[in-house]
């Protein structure tokens, strides 16, 4: 996947887990059927991960900065791998260079991933394009570059959804508008793209520019009365602060909850139990395997019903 061109990647999503449908199959008040189902459940392997959230809706699987355990984060190889593995979305981070080019990278200072001790907004795109964003990860990815948002959109269009986190700066006031312009130009809309930020002001700007995009407020703590914020359609919350009460309060308002960053099966299982809508993960293989096992349980229950 390191070098495969976009045209060799599959169109559309190669894999998606179906919805869990036990709840729709339940018939209220039928005592015998309920008892038989309980007996059948008891006979299944007693794996907590297999018995969670039965009757709910399968959450999305979002690859955090692409498939970042097999390729350098926020690079085209990481995004290609996410596409090939059938992710629902890629979470990526956008910033702007000094000459107005939107690039995909997480840290405002480029030292960690490139060795260059400089801020993104202090460099031109030509300067950013010279940096090696892959060697730190593995010599196999030497000479991998920081991609532009346009390059990422060309790769991902029609193949995977996006969660675009805008990282604003006082030095780049045009970042929101240019990001929206590019998303629209490449056909990303409310069906395949959401926009997130830790800055509520940024979400307000996005809603004014493009009200059609779902916007997510990223919360490190997830405390306080934020449920009714008008410019936040969903909330992206660190897993430690997600509770059943919080999820219920958000759902009652017609909004959703994304959980980050899920790297352990125990945590993923707990998020399923709480009814979280989107699992943002650095370990997508683990999360997809967990959901597949849940799906097998649901399919067995459907077979039993029929």
Question: Language model features by range: what are they?
Answer:
Residues 6-306:
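Phosphate-group recognition and catalysis centered on beta-loop-alpha active-site segments
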Residues 1-4:
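Selective recognition of hydrophobic, aromatic-rich stretches within alpha-helical transmembrane segments
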